[in-house]
């Protein structure tokens, strides 16, 4: 799973869908 923390996301890997969706 991914978790957004302000200006970045963390999660299982760098290609987490939440990070893609948010432009990270």
From Swiss-Prot:
GO molecular function, one term: toxin activity
Localisation per UniProt entry: Secreted
Superkingdom of the organism of origin: Eukaryota
Expression sites (tissue/organ): Expressed by the venom gland.
Main location class: secreted
Record carries keyword Secreted: yes
PTM text: Disulfide bonds are present.
Record flagged with keyword Disulfide bond: yes
Keywords from the UniProt entry: Calcium channel impairing toxin, Disulfide bond, Ion channel impairing toxin, Neurotoxin, Secreted, Toxin, Voltage-gated calcium channel impairing toxin
InterPro entries cross-referenced by the UniProt entry: Toxin_34
Family recorded in the similarity comment: Belongs to the neurotoxin 04 (omega-agtx) family. 03 (type II/III omega-agtx) subfamily.
Protein name stated in the entry: U4-ctenitoxin-Co1b
Organism the protein comes from: Ctenus ornatus
């Amino acid at each position: 799973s991914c978790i957004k923390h302000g200006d970045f996301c963390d999660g299982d890997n760098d290609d987490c869908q939440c990070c893609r969706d948010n432009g990270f």
